[in-house]
C-alpha cells in the first residue's frame, strides 16, 4: 500500500540509486493487493499483517504505531476520548482503501484487541491528507505516527 511505500521506500530511494547506478528502479504504488509474480514485479512492499501465507518476507522498516490525534481547536469543543468506545461521540476522519473498504480503527492494549468502525463526515484515501485534515480541525484522525510526528511536536496536534 501507499503507506508502506511512503514510509519505507521513499527515504531509501536516493541511497539505492547511488549504490546501484545501473539499475532502473520503477516504483508502482497501489493500495489493492497485487500478485507480485503475476504482475511481473521483482519485489513488493507490504505491511507485515498483509503478507500472504507463502510469501517470503524481509523486514525493511520498523514496526508502525497508529495514533489518534486532533487539533487543539477540535478539543476546545469536544472531550478527549479515554477509550476507543467513546469514538462514537466524535467526528472521525476516515480512510478508504482503493478496494472501497473503509478502514476499521484497530486498537490493542494488554492483549485486548478492539476494532472500531469510526464515523464521521470526511473520508479520504491518503494518509497525508488525513493528517492535514486533523491539523485543520476536521476531527479525530487515526494515522501512523511518522505522518504526525512534526505536528505533535509543535503543538498543531494533540
Question: Each PLM stretch: what is its role?
Answer:
Residues 1-53:
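Central regulatory/effector-binding core of bacterial HTH transcription factors
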Residues 38, 50-158:
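C-terminal regulatory
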Amino acid at each position: 500500500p501507499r503507506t508502506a511505500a511512503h514510509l519505507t521506500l521513499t527515504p531509501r530511494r536516493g541511497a539505492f540509486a547511488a549504490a546501484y547506478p545501473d539499475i532502473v528502479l520503477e516504483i508502482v504504488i497501489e493500495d489493492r493487493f497485487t500478485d507480485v509474480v503475476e504482475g511481473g514485479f521483482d519485489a513488493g512492499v507490504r505491511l507485515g499483517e498483509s503478507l500472504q501465507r507463502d510469501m517470503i518476507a524481509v523486514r525493511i522498516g520498523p514496526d508502525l504505531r497508529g495514533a489518534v490525534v486532533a487539533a487543539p481547536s477540535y478539543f476546545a469543543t469536544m472531550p478527549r476520548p479515554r477509550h476507543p468506545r467513546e469514538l462514537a461521540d466524535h467526528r472521525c476522519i476516515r480512510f478508504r482503501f482503493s478496494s472501497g473498504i473503509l478502514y476499521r480503527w484497530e486498537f490493542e492494549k494488554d492483549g485486548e484487541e478492539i476494532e472500531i468502525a469510526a464515523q464521521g463526515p470526511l473520508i479520504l484515501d491518503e494518509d497525508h491528507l488525513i493528517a492535514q485534515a486533523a491539523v485543520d480541525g476536521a476531527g479525530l484522525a487515526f494515522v501512523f505516527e511518522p505522518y504526525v510526528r512534526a505536528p505533535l511536536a509543535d503543538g498543531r496536534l494533540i
